[in-house]
Amino acid sequence: MIESLRQPASLMPGRLELPPPPVARPFDVVVTPPGSKSLTNRVLLLAALASGTSQIKGPLVDADDAQRMIHALRVLGAAFEQAPGGELLVTGVNGNWRVPAGGVTLDLNNAGTATRFLAAAALLSDGPVTIDGNGRMRERPIGELGAALSSLGATIRYAGLPGCPPMTVIPPADRAAIGNDVAFPTTQSSQFISALALVAPWLDRGLTMRLEGDVTSASYITMTIRLLENLGVGVRTSADERVIRIPGRAVGTGPPRAFDLVIEPDASGATYFWAAAAMVPGACARVEGLGPDSLQGDAEFPELLAT
């Protein structure tokens, strides 16, 4: 059961077999899980790239992944401040990382999401950016994303195992030389696609991504696209969702500017409360901050329980 709950809702079986309930009496609870880690990482990067100061409410900043992301974004030039009310204020770089000519190294330890997102974001640097991590991260393949960045004009170098961190990304000297079309013959991680999608609005010509193989964890790509749309980016997708077109700096209103945003509670964590209520007749578990417009695929979990 626990392993099932860790999967995106779209991968859940049509009918769930629930074990006997540990609680025999009905209950009625209202819960608010911590902010979504997936949304936090996406919003941190977008706010750091935007122009002006964004206000983020409810981010999961205590998680090690988020701390690594924030530290790396500071190195790249973004500024972070904790407001008295608990909001996180992020002053972005308007799509231009402040990297010295000699480059920088970002040690992301074991933060996989930050590793993938910042590898793609290195396209927006004026100098080399080396993505590194701990021993375990140095064994995790990132070559598929490296190949995509190479096809867009970046020079990619690996200092250790082929296709694994440490990976140095050297963007083209001329930002206008960055390509605007990339194909993924296979998709080892949906985060590779999300990483490029998050960066695309700041590319001069935007980006078209063609997904040719099986797509893993597609609900997280949908999350990224909907988040961009909520911030005013005119993303277009084909009917089969295999082609994703994201406009660049010179199109429409341009990339996102400073924004105010509330991070949704983590829907994956909420599934435990919903499942517990489903096992006890007459019980009710309500999750504040999650509704029908949630960006998270796991927010559909109650609908699966009702089938």
Predicted region positions:
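Structural preference for solvent-exposed beta-strand-turn elements
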Residues: 1-307
